[in-house]
A protein has these predicted regions:
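C-terminal interaction-tip segments
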Residues: 1-38, 98-131
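Asparagine-centered strand-capping/turn motif at beta-strand->loop junctions
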Residues: 33-35, 47-54
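Buried hydrophobic-core signal for structured, non-transmembrane domains
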Residues: 44-49, 94-96, 101
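Short proline/glycine- and polar residue-rich coil/turn motifs
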Residues: 74-81
Length: 131
């Protein structure tokens, strides 16, 4: 029978928030490192909060930094808290990183990245498969 345990993101202490300071993927903040198993996944759920008064971009590098293959992009509205990833699998010690990177959205609108405005909240967690 498959078993899971709920644990905090490895970049968090006791389910506390992680402030996203970097504004470039090359120096992105480590949010989580998956367990080292090649067969047992971590199912990651990430909630993000924009503390600013303007919309801000957020990019997650999911196990790599090749854009668009490994990069997930989001725009968070002013004051918005949103579950941006729900139970997405990752394994084999791959790393999830976050940065508020300036980008142009599909509608042509440009969003400026900013340090210390987005928080990966304590509502984020990992369902770690243990067997």
């Amino acid at each position: 029978m498959t078993q899971f345990t709920i644990v905090p993101l490895s970049g968090s202490t006791d389910f506390r928030g992680i402030l996203v300071t970097p504004t470039a993927l090359g120096s992105a903040e480590t949010i989580h490192t998956a367990q080292g198993s090649a067969s047992l996944p971590d199912l990651v759920s990430i909630e993000a909060y924009n503390s600013d008064t303007v919309a801000r971009p957020l990019k997650l590098a999911w196990g790599g930094t090749t854009d668009p293959d490994d990069v997930l992009a989001f725009v968070l509205l002013p004051g918005e808290t949103r579950m941006i990833v729900h139970q997405r699998p990752i394994r084999n010690s791959l790393i999830i990183k976050a940065a508020s990177v300036t980008m142009t959205w599909v509608d042509g609108q440009s969003y400026t990245g900013a340090a210390d405005k987005i928080v990966i909240t304590g509502g984020s967690y990992v369902q770690r498969q243990t067997s």
